[in-house]
Amino acid sequence: MPLALEGKKAIVAEVSEAAQDALSVVVADSRGVAVSAMTELRKQARENGVQVRVVRNTLARRALEGTPWECLNETFSGPTLLAFSYEHPGAAARLFKEFAKNEKDFEVKALAYEGEFIPASELDRLATLPTRDEAIAKLMSVMKEASAGKLVRTLAALRDQKQEEAA
């Protein structure tokens, strides 16, 4: 069913606004995926701070003009599902990666992060980014290990000094 011009303008404005605030964007093709599975994907997306949207290709191209995501324009062919990550740059990629494991018809076309085009073959590059909490936990463990190592070296130096004094 054709959209009226005002409806198209509204869609372009909504998608453009969503793109301005996004940390990353993932483009996928959901042909052949059951409606119930797509509903579950949308639910999981909302829980993870990801906006999922099906947009006509010409409207998507117009909406992404002048944004860092313009590099994705070449991937808009066939049904296009856009996912905008707002809380964590890898959230949409991680979500789509997990979803694609269970849905053989679901295909990630491409993604973009900080204006850089990333082909679908490199999905893991973004999907494996640690979350903020994971990054803090890793940093804390490294700092904890470093301080323990420093203590061991200090005790070893103290032991060596005592042995030299005794000799």
Curated annotation (Swiss-Prot):
CDD domains (alphabetical): Ribosomal_L10
UniProt keyword annotations, A-Z: Ribonucleoprotein, Ribosomal protein, RNA-binding, rRNA-binding
An annotated Gene Ontology molecular function: large ribosomal subunit rRNA binding
GO CC terms: ribonucleoprotein complex; ribosome
BP GO terms, sorted: translation
Described purpose of this protein according to its UniProt entry: Forms part of the ribosomal stalk, playing a central role in the interaction of the ribosome with GTP-bound translation factors.
Family: Belongs to the universal ribosomal protein uL10 family.
Assembly with partners or alone: Part of the ribosomal stalk of the 50S ribosomal subunit. The N-terminus interacts with L11 and the large rRNA to form the base of the stalk. The C-terminus forms an elongated spine to which L12 dimers bind in a sequential fashion forming a multimeric L10(L12)X complex.
Protein name in the entry: Large ribosomal subunit protein uL10
Naturally occurring in which organism (per UniProt): Chromohalobacter salexigens (strain ATCC BAA-138 / DSM 3043 / CIP 106854 / NCIMB 13768 / 1H11)
